[in-house]
């Protein structure tokens, strides 16, 4: 996780290329919210993979696909549509979902509905990497989690201060739920030296200068504002 411009998309692309180079037989999905990211992700993954192997990626095993998707395959492929097809649950297109659930978060609603209607979960991918996770509901991340083969490798990148919804992304304990004994299905363990980190914060921003960032935070959070004593204190 990190601010916009901290390199989250670059890290995801590099990780995808590395995993594909180490495990060429794995089925890997890279998904996102903004359609224009697809070309950028493909170019980055291709470049990083060639740097590591001097070969082109096997795009049959690396799927760069949109989150929603539609029938027809190819450019229309998507995570949600693949889940519905594999688990024999009803698929909703954008217009149908919006008409039924409104404009607030129709995609999150249909993801939750698909999860509740699926009798079993068919594993499809070995790894799923999600960019712009702050723009998705927890239901979509749970849907991705249920599409994974054991040991369920899910990587998601997000910016807590930049999202299309009014809510921030909950903790993994909330997103993925609990087991029957009450323990979390997913829990980020504290960092132990010599072991991979599970929660990584990208602290540098390469897109904006420090004065611009400090000014934006001061205005956005109202740091120097003096609210009225009888007011709410909110900006």
PLM feature spans:
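Conserved helicase/translocase P-loop NTPase motor core
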Residues: 88-128, 135-150
């Amino acid at each position: 996780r990190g601010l916009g411009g901290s390199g989250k998309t670059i890290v995801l692309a590099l990780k995808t290329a590395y995993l594909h180079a180490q495990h060429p037989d794995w089925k890997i999905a890279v998904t996102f919210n903004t359609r224009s990211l697809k070309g950028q992700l493909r170019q980055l993954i291709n470049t990083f993979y060639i740097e590591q192997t001097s070969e082109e990626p096997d795009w049959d095993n690396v799927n760069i696909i949109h989150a929603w998707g539609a029938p027809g395959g190819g450019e229309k492929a998507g995570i949600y549509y693949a889940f519905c097809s594999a688990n024999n649950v009803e698929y909703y297109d954008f217009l149908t979902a919006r008409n039924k659930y409104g404009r607030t978060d129709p995609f999150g609603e249909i993801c939750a509905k698909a999860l509740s209607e699926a009798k079993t979960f068919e594993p499809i991918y070995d790894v799923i990497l999600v960019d712009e996770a702050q723009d998705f509901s927890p239901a979509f991340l749970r849907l991705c989690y249920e599409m994974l083969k054991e040991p369920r490798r899910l990587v998601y990148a997000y910016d807590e201060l930049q999202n299309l919804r009014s809510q921030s992304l909950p903790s993994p304990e909330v997103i993925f739920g609990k087991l029957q004994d009450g323990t979390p299905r997913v829990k980020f363990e504290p960092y132990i030296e010599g072991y991979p980190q599970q929660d990584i914060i990208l602290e540098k921003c390469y897109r904006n200068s420090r004065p611009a960032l400090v000014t934006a935070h001061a205005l956005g959070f109202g740091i120097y504002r003096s609210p009225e004593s009888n007011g709410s204190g909110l900006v």
